[in-house]
Amino acid sequence: MMFTGFPEATVQFFLDIRFHNNIAYFEENRARYERDVKAPFEAFIQELAPAMLSIDPQMELRPYRCMARLRRDVRFTKDKSPFRDHLWVLFRRAGEPREGSVMYWFELAPSGMNWGAGTWGENRQMMDILRRRIVADPDGVRNVIKQCHLTEHHMLVGGNSFKRLEVPAGVPDDLKGWYALREVYISPESTASVDVHSPQLTKRVQEDFLSLSPLYHLLRGAYEAIPP
């Protein structure tokens, strides 16, 4: 199946499940989910697969491993709503745990969409290794960041930071923010002008993913340096 854009029915399903968030409603509308949500998400993944393999030949691309499950795990949360009203795709190395992983993501919700690259949550060991690299080779780290052309691609750096972490004197001013990060993710400033219904959506996402590949490999290097 070719990706032709996410149909309006995808977002409509999310809105409907938000207001009828129960198992009986989902079972009555399972065919809608399969047709209007699951199928276009799988086509989206397949369309991006060659680019993701060019970034990392070990990238997990099986749709059932990449797509978030619509059914929520409610065992440890106060919100007992059984279903999500949005979905996301994660591209990360096959066989690695999600928590603390280095990954690319795409998310679609009734309120909009977003995508980018970075870490899934906090990974203190990995970020400590990145901090040591910033201290040891600030020019090298800066060069990697420059290769991503964040300004030209209108990308923003996000992530929670340590508020009281002492930054070594040798860290350049432009890397102090990076040094203090507890996690890191890069995403577009805005996706409001991008048409979610267009088959060209994958082209835009692919361009951004490829532009962020130097950062992906910088983070992968830190991830792989974590002691066993």
Residue map of PLM features:
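Compact, glycine/acidic-enriched structural inserts
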Residues: 110-169
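Generic structural signal for well-ordered, non-transmembrane alpha-helical segments
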Residues: 42, 46, 139, 206, ...
